[in-house]
């Protein structure tokens, strides 16, 4: 972007995630900015002084394929990856080490979920560490570790494959509950109208600075305010919410719809087309 600016070449940039403008600094102001939703549009204006006419809201392009829905029937998919089609499915997206001074949560949650009479899939992040040292994987639980590894010697040197994303699509479509921390998994769950239980409890008493920090950030506050997710602050509350959601998945449907409306802007599967239209317009091909 710096080289382009010096060379007089127009710059079209895109904000890729909801936290990019508040937890990071936009060091170069592009000529045009593509964003997912009006929340990020307002951040670009209020925090960086960008004029509204230079910002285009398109929705979330990555979700376009999700509106197609699953291509493999539930029973076939479950059997293919080793799940019991007779039981419900819970997906756990780990907190990850970087969200805490010391990750004491992920192991505790996995051990708690292992006692459920349900299928449990732990969907690890492709490029972040999750400390569960010494944990023996429960026999009825699947550890899904997505990502193509480019270099085993360099942690995080990996990327999701189309097959990884296709598997996630099917897991989300067929699951009955999503358990997660303050991550984009919250939007994933809402998009598929799946109950979302947020983990915010700990095995020992911790100071606030040692807890999961992102619950207090600006980008996650709309999720908490939506009414579309429940935040468990004790193990008893966590277990109670688990069983409540598995029994009544319709709970908090309106709040999840609000998350989709605010975060996805247009849930119509055409976000990628809007990105292409913006790029063509920048090239002077309006209406192409």
Located regions from the model:
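C-terminal alpha-helical cap of glycosyltransferases
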Residues: 268-288
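Catalytic binding pocket for nucleotide-activated donors in carbohydrate/polymer assembly enzymes
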Residues: 28-30, 50-52, 177, 184-266
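Flexible glycine/serine/alanine-rich "lid" or loop that lines and gates the nucleotide-sugar donor pocket
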Residues: 6, 173-174, 191
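Active-site and donor-binding regions of nucleotide-sugar-utilizing enzymes
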Residues: 1-68, 96-99, 128-129, 167, ...
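Acidic donor-binding loop of glycosyltransferase active sites
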Residues: 157-164, 169-183
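Hydrophobic beta-strand scaffold residues
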Residues: 9-11, 120, 196
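Conserved catalytic-core segment of nucleotide-activated headgroup transferases in glycan assembly
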Residues: 63-158, 232, 264-267, 271
């Amino acid at each position: 972007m710096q080289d382009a600016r010096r060379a007089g070449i127009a710059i079209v940039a895109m904000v890729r995630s909801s936290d990019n403008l508040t937890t990071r600094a936009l060091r170069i102001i592009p000529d045009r900015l593509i964003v997912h939703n009006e929340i990020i549009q307002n951040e670009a204006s209020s925090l960086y002084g960008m004029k509204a006419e230079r910002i285009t809201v398109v929705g979330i392009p990555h979700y376009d394929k999700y509106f197609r829905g699953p291509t493999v029937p539930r029973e076939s998919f479950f059997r293919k990856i080793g799940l019991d089609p007779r039981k419900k499915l819970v997906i756990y997206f780990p907190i990850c080490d970087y969200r805490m001074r010391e990750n004491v949560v992920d192991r505790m949650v996995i051990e708690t979920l292992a006692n459920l009479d349900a299928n449990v899939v732990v969907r690890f992040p492709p490029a972040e560490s999750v400390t569960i040292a010494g944990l023996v994987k429960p026999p009825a639980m699947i550890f899904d570790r997505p990502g193509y590894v480019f270099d085993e010697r360099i942690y995080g040197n990996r990327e999701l494959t189309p097959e990884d994303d296709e598997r996630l699509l099917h897991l989300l479509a067929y699951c009955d509950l999503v358990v997660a921390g303050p991550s984009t998994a919250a939007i994933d769950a809402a998009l598929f109208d799946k109950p979302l239980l947020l983990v915010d409890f700990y095995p020992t008493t911790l100071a606030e600075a040692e807890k999961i920090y992102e619950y207090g950030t600006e980008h996650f506050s709309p999720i908490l305010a939506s009414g579309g997710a429940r935040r468990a602050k004790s193990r008893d509350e966590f277990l109670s919410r688990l069983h409540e959601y598995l029994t009544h998945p319709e709970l908090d449907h309106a709040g999840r719809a609000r998350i989709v409306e605010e975060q996805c802007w247009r849930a119509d599967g055409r976000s990628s087309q809007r990105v292409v239209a913006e790029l063509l317009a920048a090239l002077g091909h309006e209406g192409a």
